[in-house]
Amino acid sequence: MGNQLAGIAPSQILSVESYFSDIHDFEYDKSLGSTRFFKVARAKHREGLVVVKVFAIQDPTLPLTSYKQELEELKIRLNSAQNCLPFQKASEKASEKAAMLFRQYVRDNLYDRISTRPFLNNIENRWIAFQILTAVDQAHKPGVRHGDIKTENVMVTSWNWVLLTDFASFKPTYLPEDNPADFNYFFDTSRRRTCYIAPERFVDGGMFATELEYMRDPSTPLVDLNSNQRTRGELKRAMDIFSAGCVIAELFTEGVPLFDLSQLLAYRNGHFFPEQVLNKIEDHSIRELVTQMIHREPDKRLEAEDYLKQQRGNAFPEIFYTFLQPYMAQFAKETFLSADERILVIRKDLGNIIHNLCGHDLPEKTEEEPKENGLVILVSVITSCLQTLKYYDSKLAALELILHLAPRLGVEILLDRITPYLLHFSNDSVPRVRAEALRTLTKVLALVKEVPRNDINIYPEYILPGIAHLAQDDATIVRLAYAENIALLAETALRFLELVQLKNLNMENDPNNEEIDEVTHPNGNYDTELQALHEMVQQKVVTLLSDPENIVKQTLMENGITRLCVFFGRQKANDVLLSHMITFLNDKNDWHLRGAFFDSIVGVAAYVGWQSSSILKPLLQQGLSDAEEFVIVKALYALTCMCQLGLLQKPHVYEFASDIAPFLCHPNLWIRYGAVGFVTVVARQISTADVYCKLMPYLDPYITQPIIQIERKLVLLSVLKEPVSRSIFDYALRSKDITSLFRHLHMRQKKRNGSLPDCPPPEDPAIAQLLKKLLSQGMTEDEEDKLLALKDFMMKSNKAKANIVDQSHLHDSSQKGVIDLAALGITGRQVDLVKTKQEPDDKRARKHVKQDSNVNEEWKSMFGSLDPPNMPQALPKGSDQEVIQTGKPPRSESSAGICVPLSTSPQVPEVTTIQNKKPVIPVLSSTILPSTYQIRITTCKTELQQLIQQKREQCNAERIAKQMMENAEWESKPPPPGWRPKGLLVAHLHEHKSAVNRIRVSDEHSLFATCSNDGTVKIRNSQKMEGKTTTTRSILTYSRVGGRVKTLTFCQGSHYLAIASDNGAVQLLGIEASKLPKSPKIHPLQSRILDQKEDGCVVDMHHFNSGAQSVLAYATVNGSLVGWDLRSSSNAWTLKHDLKSGLITSFAVDIHQCWLCIGTSSGTMACWDMRFQLPISSHCHPSRARIRRLSMHPLYQSWVIAAVQGNNEVSMWDMETGDRRFTLWASSAPPLSELQPSPHSVHGIYCSPADGNPILLTAGSDMKIRFWDLAYPERSYVVAGSTSSPSVSYYRKIIEGTEVVQEIQNKQKVGPSDDTPRRGPESLPVGHHDIITDVATFQTTQGFIVTASRDGIVKVWK
């Protein structure tokens, strides 16, 4: 006993790969293990990886067909079970050598997942246990029993979704208790001897002996698959419950099984109970659940559904039932195959997710609470997608999600599950993703407040090496992110090290701790660890401080340079940081970098200490004489702060005070305020005696009167003298020989003071000219004194500016992409496209003369001479001399609106110059033919004229379009006031041979057109419908488009008709409906054929005129929205609708052409902004019913009217808010109910504003035409019906904030009533006998309704 073989020994043992020779759809990948029962392999299929289980057929008489049918039935029953993964296919292949089972491949089963990092935490264990019970419940409800639930058959995806697989209904239900051969053969495939089989499935071996007569042969298996004995015992639900309980117990004991075979048999007999294993389950609710599930008596075990109800709020949190299970189930559907789609869906739902998962967390709860809030389950979904994301926007969205969720997650989740993926993103191919990953990593690590034992070396061994390459990244944006975050990274790394050290010290001081030997050794010496950390960070900081891009250095200084000082300590802050920062002042071309230095130096100096003042003094002085005034302001602020902190020695303070005092008269307001701030701080720092003895002498020249409270800013500001004029200051500062200028100004000052008897005029004519210019700009003696006070600053600044110009010539470009026109001596030119009032000619002449002297020859070759009109041009002999005297030569207005002088003679002129002016460059005018004019014009002027003409045309087109939109009318001929059609049939037209799809009326209502599935378009004369003529036949028929014509529309303000067929053809037809004796004609003008695979056929179309464009807008079945410009035969715009929202069924365009709205087969109404071609909003019908027809509301600009499938519902939606405002309900069903006992729908709608009281005509599948009075709904009525319809009434009510007008049938009276008015004589019904497909109106001498139906009939009513 126990040694018998569980199967017939095969004559030939084949490898699992050999069975794939006859299978063409599957390619062998690798073996997943083999047992005597099954050989298991992984194979490749076009839809992904699959698991193939091969059963080698040794006995041809086995009834495999019945097993196959059973598996097929099981697959059908489990079709809707989202936590079950049955075999998708069962086949007998390989020349009947084997039977094969196929199912989707999932990488991990629960047995593997329990022992795989990152280990499952408590909330994940609960979630998996919850799903196991849910899967069992999903299987049991349709009558399926598993038969072999074990950890190897519970698959767990990368996002912790449980799939119960390998349903084993074909395995024996009962096993002999005294022979393990059958158990080993069928159930112990892992060879672990672990047993999950319910004890009642083991029976006395004698039962088998009485039925089997083959016991004499010891090689015969006790259980024969070919006999009927396996069907004797039916699998019970309680058996699966026991197995599931064993799996849940193993899950919560971290892989310790409840039973092996011998223990289970002992448990069956009451000789064993797994109390020791159950006590390892810490949670009381789970332990109680498992104990009930593994009860020895099957009757004492409950159903899976009962356990789920029992443990709701106990073992399983309420959020599993209310949110997580339904939300996570959507990702298990086939529609969510893309990782990018999952991330975008989660980002969209993030607010709702956090509200559901974290809304119960209160501020007073402990810090441990977030670990149990279920967010980790969502994190597993996010992290499972990260490595397979394709698009960079999805990757950025994923990083954004991590950043939002990180503050609500525990430490181990952040370190074990989030950090590795962030380091993965730091190697992404897109620079923006690398940069954002680094920022996110820094912020996530900063949230870690404690360090687990296994992560004590995470920074030096994992994080810093993982991002080290980013400091030398090719993309500046990545290095910028590194510089921005390295201070926080260093600070967090130091905190990690200190937390570890503190934890070790606490453990050493704890005498009861048994882990001292394990902890103190690996950590090593704190100083050694700190030094290694300093070296790693220092290497990257030095790399960033030496970066070729200044913006990287600037970012490093602006983002935590002081924190880096604290990290490195005083010595390294001085040796590493300060020494590199000083070099930034050598860059004379980037004042932003110099300014950032002074912004950052205060924090560094404060940490290094007052010893640095001697080093910083020349740097600060250099900042006070910088060429850029913004840098001076920042230097003043830095000095003020350092003085406040006591970082400046007193001699240095007075020295700086003498340098800064002249700034009190600087023309820059910020500099003056900065100087005042420094002076007031110094006054507070020194004694009163020093204020008046040492500080006041510096201030006296710049204040109007003596003051006492120098330390108050407002007081000092109120007594300051007027600053130097900005124009005088700038002119003097820009002069080339500023030293000689100040020498002469000093001599003039000495003369005023009486030190010199006389001051001779300057010998240098340039200085004389400069002085004359300054005096002409209003320089007074006080201004001269202030300039002399600023002498040292101005000379240094002048020299600094000269150095900048010199350096700019040494380099190709001081800044990439920047051209300094001022440095190159180029004067800008501009032409106003809008005419302004002309200046007097004499002023304009002076301005042009001044500018022309600086214009080079290349500029002249482009624009011609800049000689003003009053300059003597090359005048021909005999020309009017008044031109010279008045300065007004003959002028002509060019087509572009530019005034240009004209020459009137072909002779070569003389070259002349202006009197009392420096000679200007002469310009010769060209020789031209007699009796013509020569316009002195060059290439740039020609292009300028073309630009102006183009702008004028564009402006004119926009003005026309605006006028058209402002004057847009809903319809050219609205129904007459008080129009209420009586339902009298005027014309019955049966020319079409198949369903009529659409009716359209021309703008002036003289024609209306119909299109049909018979491939024809028929044009009819509206005038003939009044009954004054004998015939009402169509005047034109067009049938050359091919296919079934699905839609058509008239072009605004014309007799052009656009039609579209289901064969992809779109044609524009011209209609000549002339009066007699000429016969009407129709001919095609333009056409295009759409790609049926890419676009599909057109489902709806509209036309509108936008002034510059005549746009035919059409929507296709594959989601394309195209605006075809009929004037240029090209597309004005193209929009792409996402087919996830359903196929487009109809669309409508705003009357002002600002937006359009599309309706889909899934009930979605999506709006697009037509100006920017961007989606605006999207709203969905509550029942997701198909949108059959859309129309804009005539009064409310943001409303659309939508006819939807079922209940004859027509609703008016506010697309701005997504609210359903008004509903017409012609159905016996309760209003706004999502149930649809009435299948009838509205197929055609017509709406008119009707002088502020809008009316609506609807018609559809119930073959009735209804007139809806939207202002007075009670006045609505049925215009015409298919038969003698019962009378109806209309009532208004408010339901859930929506105003509903419901049609209710009146009760029929028993006998005939003479009081009931009749709409017409008692005759055959004149209404339609098939679905009405469309409705329209036209006006001649009275109003008419025209309807069409699916049987090809067109009827006209009045």
Swiss-Prot record:
- Quaternary arrangement and interactors, per the entry? Component of the PI3K (PI3KC3/PI3K-III/class III phosphatidylinositol 3-kinase) complex the core of which is composed of the catalytic subunit PIK3C3, the regulatory subunit PIK3R4 and BECN1 associating with additional regulatory/auxiliary subunits to form alternative complex forms. Alternative complex forms containing a fourth regulatory subunit in a mutually exclusive manner are PI3K complex I (PI3KC3-C1) containing ATG14, and PI3K complex II (PI3KC3-C2) containing UVRAG.
Q: Where in the cell is it found?
A: Late endosome; Cytoplasmic vesicle, Autophagosome; Membrane
Q: Family membership, please give it.
A: Belongs to the protein kinase superfamily. Ser/Thr protein kinase family.
Q: Which regions does the record annotate with the repeat HEAT?
A: 373-411, 413-450, 458-495, 531-570, 572-610, 612-648, 690-726
SMART domains per the UniProt record, alphabetical:
S_TKc (SM00220), WD40 (SM00320)
The cross-references to Gene3D superfamilies, in alphabetical order and at most eight, read: Leucine-rich Repeat Variant (1.25.10.10), Transferase(Phosphotransferase) domain 1 (1.10.510.10), YVTN repeat-like/Quinoprotein amine dehydrogenase (2.130.10.10)
What protein name applies here? Phosphoinositide 3-kinase regulatory subunit 4
- InterPro entries in UniProt: ARM-like, ARM-type_fold, HEAT_type_2, Kinase-like_dom_sf, Prot_kinase_dom, Ser/Thr_kinase_AS, Vps15-like, VPS15-like_hel
Q: Which reaction does it catalyse?
A: L-seryl-[protein] + ATP = O-phospho-L-seryl-[protein] + ADP + H(+); L-threonyl-[protein] + ATP = O-phospho-L-threonyl-[protein] + ADP + H(+)
Where on this chain does ATP bind?
32-40, 53
Its membrane topology is listed as: Lipid-anchor
Phosphoserine: residues bearing it? 808, 813, 853, 865
Q: Which residues carry this modification: Phosphothreonine?
A: 1316
GO terms, molecular function: ATP binding; protein serine kinase activity; protein serine/threonine kinase activity
**Where in the sequence is the active site?**
148
What ranges does the record list as Basic and acidic residues composition bias?
1315-1326
In what residue span(s) does the Protein kinase domain sit? 26-324
Please report which positions carry a covalently bound lipid of kind N-myristoyl glycine.
2
